[in-house]
Each structure stands twice: as C-alpha cells, then as structure tokens.
Swiss-Prot record:
It catalyses: Release of an N-terminal amino acid, Xaa-|-Yaa-, in which Xaa is preferably Leu, but may be other amino acids including Pro although not Arg or Lys, and Yaa may be Pro. Amino acid amides and methyl esters are also readily hydrolyzed, but rates on arylamides are exceedingly low; Release of an N-terminal amino acid, preferentially leucine, but not glutamic or aspartic acids. GO terms for biological process: proteolysis. This is Probable cytosol aminopeptidase. It comes from Shigella boydii serotype 18 (strain CDC 3083-94 / BS512). Keywords: Aminopeptidase, Cytoplasm, Hydrolase, Manganese, Metal-binding, Protease. Disulfide bonds: none annotated. Binds 2 manganese ions per subunit. Signal peptide: none annotated. The keyword Hydrolase applies. Mn(2+) 2 binds at residues 270, 275, 293, 354.
Length: 503
C-alpha cells in the first residue's frame, strides 16, 4: 500500500474518496464544513435527517455529492470532540481503513489528520495513521492454501496537512511509520510461525538474511552450542539440552556511527521457539501458544530491521537467544545446579522458569560490547500478566534515566509500559541452600523476583528489562502475535538518534 502527504483544499481533490470526520452530536469537522458549504448544505441536511450521529465507529458513504470533484465522501464518526484521545484516534483510523477496503475504494484522500488530539502534532498523527493502517490490513496466511483477498483492496492513501510547511514533517512521518510498521509485521510473522518451522536455526537464518539485505551496515554472527560451551554458557545450554534442535544465539550488529567512542545500545530477545515447560511440564490447555515464547527475539529482530532501514546514526546490537525447552532423557531437572557464564551458580527449582536461565548468560556475554545500555525483551512471567493484564508491558531497570527514557518512548508511541520496583527485599526470595541463588522466588511478586534474578547479571552496565508476557500475543478469536514492544523500542531508538517527533 502506498502512502503520501500533500496540502490542499477539499474541493480541489479529484479522488475515488475523501475521508472527513463528524463529531457528536452531528457536528462537522472544519474540512467537512467546507465540503458542506461547497455542496450547498447537502451533508448537513443528511445529518439533520438522522443519517449519522457522529458516534465512534459510525460511517456514512456518500456518492456523487454536488459540486465535489471526488466520486465519494466517507464520513467517519469521531465521538465527542473533547474526548478524542490517542486511543480513539487510532480506532477512527482503523474504522476508516476497514470501510475503505470493504467498499472497494482503491485510493483515498484522508483529512482526519485535522482532528485535534491533545498534545499531538501532525507528525504524530500521520505516523500513527500509517502504522495503524498497516496493522489493520495485516494478515498471516502464508500457510493457508486458500487466501482470501478483497476484490478491490485499498492501494493508495494520501494524508492532507494544513499548510505546505508541514509537508516535510509529514513525509518524515510516513518514512518512519512505514519502517516501524514493517518491523512490527516482521516480528508478528516470526511470532506466528509454527514451532516446527520456526526453531533457533530459523531465527538464525532470518538474522543472516537481514545482514544480506543491509550488508553496508549490518553483520550477523551465529554462535552454536560448541562455542557456547567454550564460553561457559552452561545455564543457556541446559535449557535446550532436552531438545533435538540445537540452541543458537544470533548476534546482529548494526553500525551507524563510526566514531570510536560511540558505544552500542544492546537489545536482547528471549527466543524460546517452543516452551513445553520441560520436566516441570505445562498444562496441555493453551500449550500451543508457547510458540509465542520467542516474541522477545522476534521484536528485537523487527527493531534491527527498522534501524537498518532508516540508517539511524547510532550503533545497535540485537541478540536473538534461540532455544527450545523440551522434556526428555537429556533434559535438565528440578534440583540441578548450573554454573552460569558469570561464574554464579543457580539451583533449578522449576524448569519452566527457563527464560531467565537463557537470558542470564546472554546478559553476561554482552558485557564484551561495553554497551551504552542493555535492554532485554522477554515473555518472562505469568505473574506480570496477573499484575498488569494484557494492555501494558512490565518494565524494570537498574538505571533511573534509562527507565524514564523508555516510559517516555512508550507514551510517545502508544506502546505502553509501566515500571515495577526492583527492591533489595525481593532479592531475599531467591536465596538457595545449595547455590548462589534459586531460579524462582515463590508466587509473591513473581515478575519482580524474575527481574531481580536478571539484575544480578547486569551490574556492569545500565540495564532495563521488558516483560512482555501479557502483551506479546492475543488469545481467542483474534489469536496472533501483536508485534509489541517494537513500537516502544523503535521510538526509544529514534529519540536516541535525535528524531523526537518535533515538527
């Protein structure tokens, strides 16, 4: 789908469709008022007859409106003007895209960017419209034999901005929006792949392809089990030893700043391509969704794609920690004591608390990059779902400025996160009689004790942890990967690169 931006009055638009907003109760937006004036009150007369109230989600498609060059006008209900916020704006865009796609409008000029969203500028409105449009049109049908497509799908969308001064920021918004949307799609595609296809080797192949596509700035190295053994990554290796699929760690390095003192930002993604729970096996109900236990790695992959596509002037390293947790004669057991790459020992009390055992070795491994900051992304704990539900990602950090940056990026992008504490009191729950620590700390504060466990391996750099167990995928009828927190991380990196969304 093609996007562009221009500045022009509605009466001069010659398009298949013009999209404008209507507020409750039956109040036209400024552009809709202009069209009403041109058409000698045609639109307002329809509203007076009760054709459209302006409630959120309502639509009215008008054909051959008098004195208007475009074939059709789509009126979209936007609710009460004062109540229009970021969430409702995205819902209005989503409804617009679905209606245009369903009614065969192959192209449209959208004036919804005129809507006032408190604290948001035209760059934000255009970029969010692009991201929302791509999200709305997303489908995962690679493995279906019968693919259903609209007869006349929407192919072109033009966003109107008030004056020519906003054209540059509008074009940048489209550029950024398309790159982020492609990153989200890449993460969702990886997450939705079945575990018999998407294993650690598949993740590694995707990482290599990324380096092939962006060879100017990206190199990929894949570290196998033999090299992990030589590095002392015994905790990571233990998790995968019950599987026939080799554990592989893919390291994607993007260099956008050649300065010698430009330290990299490191992103670490948990990549459990299937998590049965191991010997501490999970219940069978919903176990199919454990293919989503690699959504952290999928998100990191997507973000690395976005960074390379936009050629951001920063250095970023993405690590995909590929692994599979299976029961079997070679599987690790409750009661085992593992020696991590850091030299610290861990008593395994539950083999289903495996993500932290993989991540702890990767967090030690990335010390060699002397990072500016390290952010790990993981579907880590069911406890985080209990704490925050499915709407907000859990955030923990050992560095307040980094945490504040991530929270700000989450608010800017609409991909929200909430900070949880990392108090010393919680560390006591990880005490073990037989090792330096246990891999679980009991039910109370389970998301926090998991973060506390990881914090013991991050003392040499600024670190943040994103627990996406509640936000990485949806269950039920709309089952599928969400691509989160790609938008959050993308905004964080755009901010670091100096693109903070100002006009």
């Amino acid at each position: 789908m093609e996007f562009s931006v221009k500045s022009g009055s509605p009466e001069k638009q010659r398009s298949a469709c013009i999209v404008v907003g209507v507020f409750e109760p039956r109040r036209l937006s400024p552009i809709a008022e202009q069209l009403d004036k041109i058409s000698d009150g045609y639109i307002s007369a329809l509203l007076r007859r009760g054709e459209l109230e302006g409630k959120p989600g309502q639509t009215l498609l008008l054909h051959h409106v008098p004195n208007v060059l475009s074939e059709r006008i789509l009126l979209i209900g936007c609710g009460k003007e004062r109540e229009l916020d970021e969430r409702q704006y995205k819902q209005v865009i989503q409804k617009t895209i679905n209606t245009l796609n369903d009614t065969g409008s192959m192209e449209a000029v959208c004036f919804l960017t005129e809507l006032h969203v408190k604290g948001r500028n035209n760059y934000w409105k255009v970029r969010q419209a692009v991201e929302t449009a791509k999200e709305t049109l997303y489908s995962f049908d690679q493995l279906k034999t019968n693919k259903s497509e609209p007869r006349r799908p929407l192919r072109k969308m033009v966003f109107n901005v008030p004056t020519r001064r906003e054209l540059t920021s509008g074009e940048r918004a489209i550029l950024h929006g398309l790159a982020i949307a492609a990153a989200i799609k890449a993460a969702k595609d990886l997450g939705n792949m079945p575990p018999n296809i998407c294993n650690a080797a598949y993740l590694a192949s995707q990482a290599r392809q990324l380096a092939d596509s962006y060879s100017k700035n990206v190199i990929t190295r894949v570290i196998g089990e033999q090299q992990m053994k030589e590095l002392g990554m015994h905790s990571y290796l233990a998790v995968g030893q019950g599987s026939q699929n080799e554990s592989l760690m893919s390291v994607i390095e993007y260099k956008g700043n050649a300065s010698e003192d430009a330290r990299p930002i490191v992103l670490v993604g948990k990549g459990l391509t299937f998590d049965s729970g191991g010997i501490s096996i999970k219940p069978s109900e919903g176990m199919d969704e454990m293919k989503y236990d690699m959504c952290g790695a999928a998100a990191v992959y997507g973000v690395m794609r976005m960074v390379a596509e936009l050629q951001l002037p920063i250095n970023v390293i993405g690590v995909l920690a590929g692994c599979e947790n299976m029961p079997g004669g070679r599987a690790y057991r409750p009661g085992d004591v593992l020696t991590t790459m850091s030299g610290q020992t861990v008593e395994v009390l539950n083999t289903d608390a495996e993500g932290r055992l993989v991540l702890c070795d990767v967090l030690t491994y990335v010390e060699r990059f002397e990072p500016e900051a390290v952010i790990d992304v993981a579907t880590l704990t069911g406890a985080c779902v209990i704490a925050l539900g499915h709407h907000i990602t859990g955030l923990m950090a050992n560095h307040n400025p980094l945490a504040h940056e991530l929270i700000a990026a989450s608010e800017q992008s609409g991909d929200r996160a909430w900070r949880l504490p990392l108090g010393d009191e919680y560390q006591e729950q990880l005490e073990s009689n037989f090792a330096d620590m246990a891999n679980i700390g009991g039910r109370p504060g389970g998301a926090i004790t998991a973060g506390c466990f990881l914090s013991r391996f991050t003392r040499k750099y600024n670190w943040a942890h994103l627990d996406i167990a509640g936000t990485a995928w949806r269950s039920g009828k709309a089952k599928g990967a969400t691509g989160r927190p790609v938008a959050l991380l993308a905004q964080f990196l755009l901010n670091r690169a100096g693109f903070n969304g100002e006009e």
